[in-house]
From Swiss-Prot:
Endpoints of the signal sequence: 1-29
Active site (record annotation): 498, 604
Enzyme class: hydrolase
Record has Repeat as a keyword: yes
Region (A): 30-357
Protein name as catalogued: Endo-1,4-beta-xylanase A
Species whose genome carries this gene: Thermotoga neapolitana
Amino acid sequence: MRKKRRGFLNASTAVLVGILAGFLGVVLAATGALGFAVRESLLLKQFLFLSFEGNTDGASPFGKDVVVTASQDVAADGEYSLKVENRTSVWDGVEIDLTGKVNTGTDYLLSFHVYQTSDSPQLFSVLARTEDEKGERYKILADKVVVPNYWKEILVPFSPTFEGTPAKFSLIITSPKKTDFVFYVDNVQVLTPKEAGPKVVYETSFEKGIGDWQPRGSDVKISISPKVAHSGKKSLFVSNRQKGWHGAQISLKGILKTGKTYAFEAWVYQESGQDQTIIMTMQRKYSSDSSTKYEWIKAATVPSGQWVQLSGTYTIPAGVTVEDLTLYFESQNPTLEFYVDDVKVVDTTSAEIKLEMNPEEEIPALKDVLKDYFRVGVALPSKVFINQKDIALISKHSNSSTAENEMKPDSLLAGIENGKLKFRFETADKYIEFAQQNGMVVRGHTLVWHNQTPEWFFKDENGNLLSKEEMTERLREYIHTVVGHFKGKVYAWDVVNEAVDPNQPDGLRRSTWYQIMGPDYIELAFKFAREADPNAKLFYNDYNTFEPKKRDIIYNLVKSLKEKGLIDGIGMQCHISLATDIRQIEEAIKKFSTIPGIEIHITELDISVYRDSTSNYSEAPRTALIEQAHKMAQLFKIFKKYSNVITNVTFWGLKDDYSWRATRRNDWPLIFDKDYQAKLAYWAIVAPEVLPPLPKESKISEGEAVVVGMMDDSYMMSKPIEIYDEEGNVKATIRAIWKDSTIYVYGEVQDATKKPAEDGVAIFINPNNERTPYLQPDDTYVVLWTNWKSEVNREDVEVKKFVGPGFRRYSFEMSITIPGVEFKKDSYIGFDVAVIDDGKWYSWSDTTNSQKTNTMNYGTLKLEGVMVATAKYGTPVIDGEIDDIWNTTEEIETKSVAMGSLEKNATAKVRVLWDEENLYVLAIVKDPVLNKDNSNPWEQDSVEIFIDENNHKTGYYEDDDAQFRVNYMNEQSFGTGASAARFKTAVKLIEGGYIVEAAIKWKTIKPSPNTVIGFNVQVNDANEKGQRVGIISWSDPTNNSWRDPSKFGNLRLIK
């Protein structure tokens, strides 16, 4: 028998150096052939190694029926591995006891190999189990998908935290989706770092002067200033800037080495009085580059008068010859003065785990998985052509490519000489060569855009804007030259990019193109492109194409061009986030597909892990990555559904650290991580059934109900919970409320069959909201069948119930009173609900349907008070005067701050009335500085009114939802669902502000007393420079009411 090597980490093709800082809780998986070892003499030391050669080495079963044995069936190394079988619960597995062996706050690395015998990919998870003075708790550390019959190494950094001396600490390896297969574990190792510190290669606090820093741009001034400092007494002051790229710079050539990743830190400060964007950028040129590149390391919003840290990483590939590496600081505001302090550059080779990992060879190729549906594309920076790992990942998964920047006008234009444009095609030609070598097609991006086009392109030799005739000829020359150069090599072009602005009267962006040529430039661009290459497919490309107003403008534009034979398709960019409602994307695809003969390309797909524009995670939260994956699965289900019109889906970036989104803040928007490993978002496309359940979140209002099978008004105050079937259709809509120790639930279920003993609903409540792989004593569930029979897991729980029959549907109501529990406002409980149809379960949160045995995947409900106001019946005169009738109804105030503060920004006191024809709103706005200079109406001093007539509180706008806006000069503008025909307003300026009176015509309901609608009112505050500095509403602190009615409050109509 060959003995296993002790003292090694078999990190298949992985090189690990350094400590674990910054990687805690993130799974890192290596791939490839086994056999490359990292010796203990490097910066990691091993203190636990389980080889399972002839025995279980102390590993124990987790789960009452689980059997673990040393087995010779298969082995990653040596002749034995640990066999795990007879699992009956999804969280059953093998437990590695580390009690007394690890310390709180210390960084560790778990490494193990796993092999599974099912016939499809399976999800594996690692849990940390802790028992200490705080009690027993479980935390999921990592998720990784493993293909059948393949030894996969999984690496899991962890750092335990104990309260007092722990009675138990262990790690559990399990496969939490299915139990009907055997898996094996081998080479379990736990390592900890030896002493090692980061290597600082450059650092300055400017206390000793400017050093090697230089002004960037003519006339720019840099100086040492004692006025402000992040540390010490001095900082670097940058002034007299005239362009965005002007700033302060330092050459790092000779300091930074090839084949290394560096961490950059700096602190920046500005005092303009407004938020500003300041950017840390690397200017670089390798001998293989045809031109100098400018790559953001980090951009951040910097509030006035605050020091903000910019931090990011930058990698210099091995094997390149460096000609220029210059670090500089810039701002999108070309005249902004700013300060820089405490700049530091760290060689992370000695500061982190660095995994030199290869693309996973064993996973399916995306282009093969989707070959019957559409091409799979990827947007590429030119640096991939010198990186063999990049090339391997691209060629395995993609059959279409797009130049990320190198086919845009500013990359192709080299100047103008004697009135003729000069071009540079060297870098762009590399994309053609690469595609041809790897069996790929090329999408050209982009010909006509308001951005990344040089200013001189629109001007004559004297700096004056060209005439329409001159601009038309320049457009013709540019398109004929570029498209002609790539004729027969680029199969599709984004001819016009981002020309639509739904806030303009004609729906078109007021770009320099429009300024000179009016709307004609769009049609001419397509005409010239068709002339230059009749066989190329021509597309109009834009972002947020799913927003209803913008969608409709694009539809009309493209339909007109299609009827003229000038266009072939629509490019839907799909730069989306976790806040995006995927149903709106399907509605857009559905509408666009009605244009005869149209093609659709998904041109720039990525999914941010954020819901807002301000958060910034140091590491991607597990729940965000799971939600991202579920969004991706939804998307590709839709893309496949419409594959008769969708012919190309392109990801905007190869892997997370190459994404444009990661330069602005930490983000992980793509399907491969920075180490070339497939994320859950990849498996969402290939095998969505393996995804971990996405624990849902919602909120319910306080209230009581009489359980008689009718939806009391109290239920209307809570956001509905929807359960979907396999096709994405709503299976059930459920509302819950809480009071004291009782949860009330009312629901309506779609069910075409009548099988009383096999149809029903199940409610699961986890009062302490602790997640465990078993039920705790307080966990409660009730199953109610449509024959009125029920199953309750606790004898002391009081249940009242009602089932109401209907045609192809039924309703139910329950109250569940749990003794010894007192629910409280602003607390959280675990919760789930499932619909049972003909014996099949459809769950809201735990899609493994294992709620009866564990609470790991229950959803979370926040218990809230009631956000409700009343509107009295009455009809005012809309004239800007405050009629006496307004004093008969309740006054509410805008106090939910999304931007600014209650003390410094505009707020309003609001009253609401109603009659059979209209909803009436009076807003008395406190705002001493009034401005409407901004071209965006939402950034002017204005009042916005949001209504949700059916109060469904969906996460997207239904037909009854609407957003109305009026500024202090009585100029109206509209969001989704609103129109001038429904909106009558009057505005009066008063000392210190203005009064708004508005009437909004009902659209879908006939109101009556006790009707409850969704409602919000928002005040936008602009400063004297026309910048929006305040957003304060009645009910929504997230500033998402414009797209998400679930943020609205409740308005009850009374007599």
